[in-house]
Structure formats: structure tokens, C-alpha cells
């Protein structure tokens, strides 16, 4: 492809000029082949500028950098381009390379601490019911229509993201609904993407290992609402008003407690779902979701608001939500087809607010004791660990503290951090996660409910020196046969 086309709309200067055509773009020097363009990105673990020579040796004919490269004479017959921000440059060039695909599909972005995944699945169900072909990008998997593609992170890097958009355009997708993480906003992965709608679910503590302060975390989320045509905002959340003031374009507020444009009333909750009246202007529909929890009413409202802005009738929205299957690893009752006398629920809750939501939801339909099994991830926000300990212990009859994804940290030390927040004497420590689930199932009695929180849909566990297969749903079904 012609280099000038790739550089369109980008501010840059030539340090060395030679090559005018490139094969493809890469930011990983190991993937560079003859004729490629390599972008030097400064990361948190390493700096791509250190690998410029490696990329050149592998065949790079164009190198884009934001820092001065040493020993320019080394790069014979190579074009070197200087930019002020390599990440923004990667996003712009990736979009140009793939033909600016985000201009050819309607993109709906969902951000917030909790609820993003469920909301994207709700949106997909509604839009498909309305007759559209839909793509989905998120934590569990990526979808182009019915085609499922493995997902490696909530929001892909800009190069992979633009490729997915291009694939959607090629497959004649009408809408893409996507989870937009705070990392992706801060790191410019979605820079230049034209969002038709942006949904704000909520904001609670998470990712402070990365953002350092809560204000930084919030400001990263705000970026989405400054780049969207329309915004759909949870006004019941304490940060909703701030988002409302900063958001551009048309806005719809939603909630249960406060006055808002789109409201849920007459809430009825039970073990297999929730029912509520949805009121928007002069319309009202009673909607019955087959997933429990008040927080899922909020997820539904955000999705409803965005779809109303897209002109989809409330009746169609109701039909789609009522027909929607459960989302993997989100309040998933693994034992519903077994007659055990107790239930085991798997949920992705890995933040204090997420854990509080799932335990409060489970408490609503627990006739016996509520038993929680959870831990905290290694190499992540340490400040939330004692809070997680306190929340889990206070809201459970029995809390079993265990490992999550310890990564490079010692699981015992992570558990120690969790225990610092526990004020009650109702906990057990079982370091091995499978053993912890077994313990919960062994002590469960008639009418008890076990909530296994933290991993949800994940089918792996990240240890210090390896990643192992670990699907809690499989583990639970195996233990049913063993116990």
C-alpha cells in the first residue's frame, strides 16, 4: 500500500525518506516481515524503540517512532518517520490501512466498571431481533454475525481492532457493539473510532494498579463520551451526573431511583430472573429477563436506551430481551439441571462492587446459607483486596478465600491482603481454587447457594510460571460426580 495513503491525517516529519510502498503494519518486531512498517510503541513492560533494529533486521522498510533512534546509519534503505505520539499514530495508520472501516458501520461503545459484557450481549440480541447483522467485541469473545472469534483482551489494540472492523464491513455487518475498557481509552486503542452511541454503566473501584488514582480512571472513561454522537447514561450512579455534563451530542438518562428519561418501576426479583416496567415518554412495557439481579435491570436499561435512539420499537426490544439466553459466566447457575438441593453460581465479579452485586442478588433467593468462594488476581490493584475481603465476608454466611489468577505473586500473600479486610469469624482459607470449590460443595446443605466469583467465563488460571486449563463450570460438574 502507498505510504502517503497510510499517513493521511497524521502529523509527522521524515527523519529519513526512501520507501513509498509497504506490505503491512506491525508494532511487534517479532511479526515484522520484508516490506513492513514498524511502529515503536512505549509500553509499561518494555519500549518498542528498543526493538527498532530487530524490526529492521526482519525486513521493516518504514519505522515510525516518537523518540530519536540511535545509530541512524544502521537503517540503510529505510524510511524513518517521527511523530509526537506513536499510539495515536498507530490508530490513525491502522484505520487508513484498512480503509477507515469504522465509517462504514454503526458502532456502539459500552464503558463502565461492571456490566459491559452483559450489556453487549443484550444489545446484540435486540439489534438482531430488529433484523440487523451485528458484530460484538468484548471480554468473552468477538463475534462477526454468528462467527465466533477468540478474544485476548476486552478491547483489542488499534491495529487488531481496525482489522476486525474491516472484517465486519466485508461481512456486511450493520452494527458493532463493543466493550470499551478504560485501558483502551487511555492507550488510544479506539482513537479516531466514530461511535454512534456510548453507554455509561457505572463506576466503582478497579484498575488502580494501572490508573493510580480514581480520578484518572474516571477521566479515561470520559474520553468515550467526548467522541460519541449520542450518550446513554446511568444517572443513579454517583458519577452519572459528571458524565452527563461532559458528554456531547444527544443524551438519554436511565435509572431506577432518580428522575430520568428511561426508568424501570415495579421491580420483581426471583432466583431465575427479574421483571420490571420500562417507561419511556408515553410508552410502557413489562419486561421479564431470564437473568437475576437488580444490576441486570440497569444493564437492560442502558441497552434499551441505545436501541431507542436507533429507532427500534420498545415492543421489539422487549421480545429480544425476553428471548435472550444467559451470558456465559454472568450469574450462571451451573447446577440448574441437577437435583442437588443447593445451587452453585459462577460469576465474573472481580471488583468490590461486582462482588457486592452478585452476593446481594443471590441473597434475595437464598433460603438457606450463602457461601462465597473468591480471591483476588495477582499483579493487579492491591488496594481492593481488603475491600473484597470485607464485602465477601459481610454478605456471606461463609466466605471461602482462595486463589484467583495469582500470576507472578505468591497466592498466600494475596490471600493475606484479602484477610486484612475481614472483620468476622466466618471465613475459611483454601488456597487451591478447585479445593476451595470442593470445600464449599462438601459443606453445602439443603437450600444453600454457593457463589464462585472472580473468573466467570474464563477457562484458564494464570499461575507464576504457566497458564493451566481451568473452567469452573467443568470443575463443578466434575465435583458433582465425585462428592
From Swiss-Prot:
Source species: Clostridium botulinum (strain Hall / ATCC 3502 / NCTC 13319 / Type A)
Q: Which family does it belong to?
A: Belongs to the MurCDEF family. MurE subfamily.
Using the UniProt record, name the top-level EC class of this enzyme in a single word: ligase
* Cofactors that this protein relies on: Mg(2+)
As for subcellular location, the record says: Cytoplasm
Q: How is it modified after translation?
A: Carboxylation is probably crucial for Mg(2+) binding and, consequently, for the gamma-phosphate positioning of ATP.
Q: Which GO terms describe its cellular component?
A: cytoplasm
Q: Which GO terms describe its biological process?
A: cell division; cell wall organization; peptidoglycan biosynthetic process; regulation of cell shape
The catalytic activity of this protein is classed by the Enzyme Commission as 6.3.2.13
Q: Which transformation does this protein catalyse, written as a reaction?
A: UDP-N-acetyl-alpha-D-muramoyl-L-alanyl-D-glutamate + meso-2,6-diaminopimelate + ATP = UDP-N-acetyl-alpha-D-muramoyl-L-alanyl-gamma-D-glutamyl-meso-2,6-diaminopimelate + ADP + phosphate + H(+)
- Which InterPro entries does its entry note? Mur-like_cat_sf (IPR036565), Mur_ligase_C (IPR004101), Mur_ligase_C_dom_sf (IPR036615), Mur_ligase_cen (IPR013221), Mur_ligase_N (IPR000713), MurE/MurF_N (IPR035911), UDP-N-AcMur-Glu-dNH2Pim_ligase (IPR005761)
The family database entries (PANTHER family) matched by this protein are listed as: MUR LIGASE FAMILY MEMBER, UDP-N-ACETYLMURAMOYL-L-ALANYL-D-GLUTAMATE--2,6-DIAMINOPIMELATE LIGASE MURE HOMOLOG, CHLOROPLASTIC
- Which residues of the sequence carry a binding annotation for UDP-N-acetyl-alpha-D-muramoyl-L-alanyl-D-glutamate? 29, 154-155, 181, 189
**Corresponding gene?**
murE
Q: Which NCBIfam families match?
A: murE, PRK00139.1-2, PRK00139.1-4
The record, for Pfam families, names: Mur_ligase (PF01225), Mur_ligase_C (PF02875), Mur_ligase_M (PF08245)
| Entry binding sites for ATP | 112-118
Annotated binding of meso-2,6-diaminopimelate, by residue: 380, 404-407, 454, 458
The name of this protein is UDP-N-acetylmuramoyl-L-alanyl-D-glutamate--2,6-diaminopimelate ligase
Q: In which pathway does it act?
A: Cell wall biogenesis; peptidoglycan biosynthesis
Motif Meso-diaminopimelate recognition motif in this chain: 404-407
Positions of post-translational N6-carboxylysine modification = 221
What does the UniProt record say this protein does?
Catalyzes the addition of meso-diaminopimelic acid to the nucleotide precursor UDP-N-acetylmuramoyl-L-alanyl-D-glutamate (UMAG) in the biosynthesis of bacterial cell-wall peptidoglycan.
What keywords is this UniProt entry annotated with? ATP-binding, Cell cycle, Cell division, Cell shape, Cell wall biogenesis/degradation, Cytoplasm, Ligase, Magnesium, Nucleotide-binding, Peptidoglycan synthesis
Main localization is cytoplasm
Task: Tell me the superkingdom of the source.
Answer: Bacteria
